[in-house]
Amino acid sequence: VMSINIKRNQLKRVVIVGGGLGGLRLAEDLCNSNLQVVLIDKNNFHQFPPLIYQIASAGIDPSSISFPFRQIFRKRKNFYFRMAEARAVFPDKKILQTSIGKIEYDYLVFAAGTTTNFYGNANIEKWAIPMKTVSEAMGLRNAVLSNLERALTCATEEERQELLNVVIVGGGATGVEIAGALSEMKRYVIPYDYPDMDSSLMHIYLLEAGDRLLAGMSQDSSKKAYEFLTSMGVDVQFGKMVTDYKDHKVLMKDGQEIPTRTFLWVSGVKAQPITGIDGDHLGRGFRIVVDEFNRIPGMDGLFAIGDQCLQTADPAYPGGHPQLAQVAIQQAALLAKNIQKIAEGATDSQLKPFRYKNLGSMATIGRNKAVVELGKFHSQGFFAWVLWLVVHLRSILGVKNKVMVMLNWLWKYVSYNDSIRMITYATKPKEVRDRLKREQTTHLGTDLLENEE
C-alpha cells in the first residue's frame, strides 16, 4: 500500500488541498508557524491563472507562469509537498483519502478551486477546449497552430472554413482576453508565418448568453471591451445560448450554426467536488458553504477558501463573494492567522471574521487595450493596459519569472515576434502511463480504512 510517508511530530498538522493562489498563500503564511504543513496538489507546480490565456495564444512560455512547489518551499522546516489528488474526506476519523493513500490531519483546508462547468452536455464536454489550466492552454495552442497548418492543405473549402473559424463561448474575462489575444495573432502573426494563406478567412466568434461582456464589471467597461474587440475584428454576439456541438458545428438555441474545429468553452465553472462533503454543505455552483472564519459548519477542523467556498457572512456580500483571485488570497492570509489562534485554543470571539476588501478588477483585450476599475477610478486603453501589466507582474512569483515575462512582453511589444509557435505534444513513457492508470483506480475512498493498518 502506498503511503504519504510523513511522520507525525508533536506539532498539529494542517493539510492544504490545492496550490492555487489561495492554497499557496496559506502554505507560505503558515510556514513560519508552529504547525506541520502538508500541501497536496495534483501538479508539482503552481500555475498563475490570470495569464493562462497568454499561453494559449503562444504569447508566453508555460514556464514563465508556472512555479514548482518544491522550489518555492525550499529550506522550510515542517513543510511537506505531496503530488496527489484528494479523493474523499472522513471528518469523524480526521482522515483525507488521496490517490497515494490516506493522510491524518488536525486541520484540513480545501483550496482546490473550480473546474469547467459543461452543464451536463456530454458532446460539449467531449469536444470543447476548456481554459482553466496550463496544459489546457497548451492544448489550445497546439490545436490552433495545427489547424492553421491543415487549412493550407485540406481538400475542401468547407473543411478549410471549419479549421479557420474559432468559436469562443463565454463573455467573461477569460473569453474576452482569449478573443483579443487570438485576434492579435490573426492580425500580426498569420500574414508573416503563413504568407500563402488569406488571413481574412480566419473568423473569431465570441458568443455570450447575456446582453453584455464582463458582467462582473461596470457598464462602461463592458461597452469599451465590446468596442475594442469589434475594432479588432472579433464577431461578438449576445443572447446566444449554445446547446450542442455536432459534426464540427456549434449549434445554438435560435437555430444558428457556426462550423468550427476550434471550439472553446469558457462559459462557467463549478467548484471541485470532494466525496464526504454532502449536498447539505454545498451552495450554488457546488461551492462548500462556510462561516465567517471559513470553517465548514458541523465538521471539526475542516475549512474551505477561495473559489471552492461560498461565504455569506460578509455583510457587503450576502450572496457570497465573486470567484476572483483576490478573494482567495485575502481569505488565505486571514485563515493563516486564525488557524494558528485556533491551534492555541482560541475561542470564536478571539478570531477575526473575513471581510473582503475589493481592490478592483481588470481585463486586458490586447496591446494598449485594457479596462481597469479600482474603486471609483475607471480607466480604459493604454494606461489601463500598463496598470494591468504592473499588477500582474507584481503578483507573479519568482524574480526570474518576473524578468522573463517582462522581457518577453517588451520584446513582443516592440517586434510582434514570438518564438513559441511550436506544435509540441508531451509523450508519456509506458511506466508513467501505467502508474497513472493504477492511481486512477485505487484509493477512491471505498477501500476504507478498516482493513489498512
Model regions and ranges:
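FAD-site-proximal beta/loop scaffold in flavoenzymes
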Residues: 126-156, 248-251, 257-330
